[in-house]
Amino acid sequence: MKCPFCSHQETQVVETRVSEDGDFIRRRRQCGACDKRFTTYERPEVNFPTVVKKDGRRVEYDREKLLGSFKLALRKRPVSTVQIDSAIERIEEKLLNLGQREILSSRIGELVMRELKKLDKVAYVRYASVYRSFEDIDEFRALVDEVRK
């Protein structure tokens, strides 16, 4: 595998670990030229449902986009990357178990909100305030009151 730092073609695997649930393999690699280390992840290739956007467009499921949503909502919050990865894996498992060829983006948004609510209430409110497109402060206040219960 090519080194992401110097683009040298030869890297060596120095450590391999299987995730707790066995869903992926984490490998630490070291470049033979610059000696820097980096991490790669191996996952089985699966076919996720096509995402149907609000405007009717159909796009491929994108794990990185989902990860970006989590990172934005959880910015400067005390949640580890391991917790975020676990939440994304639970969402992906649900998407695969649906057995459908297509899924509405709004359904994915609901799954994200459910996971964020479990991880961090502030992140949940951040995400929901954008996702639900509140019209006024009363809708926002109702969400905060719901979270406080």
Curated annotation (Swiss-Prot):
Gene Ontology biological-process annotations: negative regulation of DNA-templated transcription
Cofactor(s) listed: Zn(2+)
Keywords, alphabetical: ATP-binding, DNA-binding, Metal-binding, Nucleotide-binding, Repressor, Transcription, Transcription regulation, Zinc, Zinc-finger
Zinc finger (unnamed) in chain: 3-34
UniProt key word Zinc-finger: yes
Transmembrane segments: none
The protein's role, per its UniProt record: Negatively regulates transcription of bacterial ribonucleotide reductase nrd genes and operons by binding to NrdR-boxes.
Similarity field: Belongs to the NrdR family.
Record's protein name: Transcriptional repressor NrdR
